[in-house]
Structures are given as structure tokens and as C-alpha cells.
């Protein structure tokens, strides 16, 4: 089974780096190869992921299932942050400073908010992701 994702070209991670098919490939292969328990059933049937261009990802499965469309949409690991993470269980991105963006941690995402600060057991403070693709234009 093949699922092809045609990505938008205006999506950026919260640190301003473009989201591309390389991130899709990296995420799916990282989760599959590391046998991350939460994603194991979703990624175990992924045979390969191809990226014919910057905004196209082709995900090949060893089985046929209507769940594959859901199983192919885990695009949450920015390759530029996670590529050197060997032990995902020990990685705490919210505690590590971002390598290029002052005041930001390595907890980088695609959503409308980013972590500003937190206190365990008390609060989490989020702020607007200025790189979010769906912000209203001025």
C-alpha cells in the first residue's frame, strides 16, 4: 500500500525552519526503527518512505489497512533537532536550550503555541508561535 503526502510549502517549525518531506521520512523511520511503544503498531508495517522532492513524501506499507492513512501521519519530530538523539527515552527537549534560537528550548513543534515556561505540578505557560502557518495576515 502506498500513501502519498503532498505537503504545503509554507509550514515552518516553531523555530522557523521549514517543515519538509525529510521531516516526515525522519519521523516515521525514527519511530519505527526505535520501536517506540506508543507508535509501534502504527509504524511496524512501514516498509520505506521516499521523498521525491522537498514537499512530497511517499509512505509504503507491507499491509493493506484503512488505518494506514492514520499511521502515516506522525510528523512531529523535527529532523534538525532529533537527528542526533540516540536515546529518545532520555531526551528532554524542554530542558535543553535551542542551538540557534535564543530563549527557546529544543521542544519544537508545528502548532499555534510554544512553551514559554513551566513549573512541574503547577503550571505551563504557552505563547503564540509566530511561525505558525495559519496566523492571520496583517
Spans of model-derived segments:
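Second-shell loop/turn segments in exported
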Residues: 7-15, 45-47, 101-103, 112-114
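Short, solvent-exposed secondary-structure boundary motifs
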Residues: 34-43, 101-108
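Aromatic- and charge-enriched surface segment that lines or borders ligand/interaction sites
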Residues: 1-37, 52, 58-60, 68
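Gly/Pro-rich hinge or "lid" segments in bacterial periplasmic/extracellular proteins
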Residues: 75-138
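A short, polar/proline- and glycine-enriched secondary-structure boundary/capping micro-motif
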Residues: 15, 69-72, 136-138
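Surface-exposed binding/hinge segments that line
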Residues: 6, 41-93, 117-119
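A bilobed periplasmic-binding-protein/Venus flytrap-type ligand-binding module shared by bacterial periplasmic
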Residues: 8, 62, 127-131
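Extracytoplasmic/secreted envelope proteins and their assembly/folding machinery
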Residues: 21-28, 43-46, 123
Amino acid at each position: 500500500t502506498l500513501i502519498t503526502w503532498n505537503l504545503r510549502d509554507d509550514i515552518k517549525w516553531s523555530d522557523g525552519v521549514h517543515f519538509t518531506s525529510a521531516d516526515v521520512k525522519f519521523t516515521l523511520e525514527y519511530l519505527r526503527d526505535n520501536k517506540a511503544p506508543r507508535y509501534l503498531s502504527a509504524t511496524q508495517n512501514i516498509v520505506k518512505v521516499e521523498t521525491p522532492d522537498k514537499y512530497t513524501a511517499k509512505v509504503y506499507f507491507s499491509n493493506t489497512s484503512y488505518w494506514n492513512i492514520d499511521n502515516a501521519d506522525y510528523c512531529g519530530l523535527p529532523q534538525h533537532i532529533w537527528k542526533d538523539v540516540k536515546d529518545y527515552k532520555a531526551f528532554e527537549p524542554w530542558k535543553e536550550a535551542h542551538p540557534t534560537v535564543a530563549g527557546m528550548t529544543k521542544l519544537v513543534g508545528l502548532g499555534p503555541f510554544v512553551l514559554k515556561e513551566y513549573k512541574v505540578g503547577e503550571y505551563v505557560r504557552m505563547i503564540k508561535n509566530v511561525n505558525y502557518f495559519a496566523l492571520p495576515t496583517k
